[in-house]
């Protein structure tokens, strides 16, 4: 006789009922809603996302189009199921619709191995591909340049396409390039990527400037004048502080999480969260498992070392790097983060900075792994349901999914309108403000992209 059978026979029926009731109570206390209650949360989540736009701060589909098909949109149909590709993508139009996405900042990313004219060309090619996406699927996408545009496009039943530039190296140390990128639709600039720029320190490189240089501060001021969001994801803590001190408008972290919960330098420490609240800005939670789970962050260190080794071994063969890295992962399984842990980061940022200063910046299609329960862009309703289960009100959820970033956009637009009345375009040059101009020790051909 099995132990379970013996226990079942020994327990009276009344006691069994009591045990089951107790188990249900414990399950609810542990955060598991009853099936009926969970269905209510899920239905409410969908209703909320039909009433208010979900605006995600960071998605790398443009990079995928460049790397997979050299920007040939006729070779990769976003209206089809891209999860069947090798490797699978996390974004396509059917899944965007299922996820009730209302607006998306598409990242126009340039590898940090590119500098000067090469970087500028690459970023404008990425900007161009976002415009062509919107033109190719007009029934689904429309370009947006203001908060009002996002809301208008959402009401029309389409998805607002916004552009975010990832990495200050992509402006080629030129404020004129920055202005032209804005004219072409870019609405945020991430001041650095993995490596320092000539005017700002990154979180993941050696600090060479002690934050922002004089030219770096001028970049922030010109962004304020233009109406471009200052994005502090990827930058060092000192760069965060310098930008917060310099900016006259609210800042954003387009895809970062809470360092108190996962001690990654890409995440935001509590003292900065409080400064973001005072600034009126927003931290948009990144879904990368290594930024969400401390266990995963520690476990991923050997993976990062292997990735670096393969990139150095095959610098001109990214497909081989991807294939060998996939084989390495198969032999070295890693733990994963969960949807609930993503919600924990939202909780923490709300608790430290306030409900008005947290949003979503998934980094889909820029991350190779995703949390359990947040596998792709179709899963946003599940995250919203989890927030409702935790007691967030519908109004607070609407702030998190899009209301907060739209508020920040409006404030940035208002600041720009005010500054443009008294301030002409900056004519500052890096060689005049920062003497001598620094040259990154990772610049081509001395190094490779650390991504």
Specify the residue positions occupied by each region the protein language model found.
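Alpha-helix-loop-beta-strand connector modules within alpha/beta enzyme cores
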Residues: 209-224, 243-253, 383
């Amino acid at each position: 006789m099995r132990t379970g059978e013996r226990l079942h026979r020994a327990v009276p029926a009344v006691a069994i009922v009591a045990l089951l009731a107790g188990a249900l109570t414990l399950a609810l206390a542990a955060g598991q809603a009853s099936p009926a209650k969970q269905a209510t949360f899920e239905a409410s989540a969908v209703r909320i996302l039909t009433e208010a736009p979900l605006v995600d701060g960071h998605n790398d589909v443009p990079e995928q189009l460049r790397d997979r098909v050299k920007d040939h949109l006729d070779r990769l149909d976003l209206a089809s199921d891209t999860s069947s590709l090798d490797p699978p993508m996390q974004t396509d139009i059917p899944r965007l619709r299922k996820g009730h996405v209302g607006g998306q900042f598409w990242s126009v990313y340039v590898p940090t191995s590119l500098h000067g004219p090469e970087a500028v060309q690459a970023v404008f090619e990425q900007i161009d591909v976002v415009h062509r996406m919107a033109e190719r699927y007009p029934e689904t996408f429309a370009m947006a340049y203001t908060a009002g545009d996002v809301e208008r496009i959402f009401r029309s039943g389409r998805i607002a396409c916004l552009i975010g530039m990832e990495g200050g190296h992509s402006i080629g140390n030129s404020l004129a390039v920055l202005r032209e990128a804005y004219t072409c639709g870019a609405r945020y600039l991430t001041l650095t990527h993995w490596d320092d720029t000539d005017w700002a320190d990154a979180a993941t490189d050696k600090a060479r400037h002690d934050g922002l240089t004089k030219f770096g501060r001028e970049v922030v001021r010109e962004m304020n004048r233009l109406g471009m969001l200052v994005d502090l994801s990827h930058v060092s803590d000192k760069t965060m502080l310098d930008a917060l001190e310099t900016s006259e408008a609210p800042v954003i972290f387009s895809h970062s999480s809470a360092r108190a919960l996962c001690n990654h330098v890409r995440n935001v420490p509590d003292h900065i969260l409080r400064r973001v609240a005072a600034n009126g800005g927003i931290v948009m939670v990144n879904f990368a498992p290594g930024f969400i789970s401390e266990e995963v962050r520690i476990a991923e260190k050997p993976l990062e070392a292997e990735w670096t080794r393969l990139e150095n071994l095959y610098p001109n063969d990214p497909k081989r790097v991807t294939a060998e890295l996939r084989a390495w992962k198969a032999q070295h399984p890693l733990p994963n983060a969960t949807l609930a842990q993503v919600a924990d980061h939202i909780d923490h940022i709300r608790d430290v900075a306030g409900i008005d200063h947290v949003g979503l910046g998934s980094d889909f299609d820029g991350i190779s792994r995703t949390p359990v329960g947040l596998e792709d862009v179709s899963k946003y309703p599940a995250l919203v349901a989890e927030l409702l289960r935790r007691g967030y009100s519908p109004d607070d959820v609407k702030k998190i999914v899009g209301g907060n970033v739209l508020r920040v956009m409006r404030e940035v637009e208002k600041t720009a309108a005010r500054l443009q009345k008294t301030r002409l375009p900056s004519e500052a040059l890096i060689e005049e403000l920062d003497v001598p101009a620094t040259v990154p020790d990772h610049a081509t051909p001395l190094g490779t992209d650390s991504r």
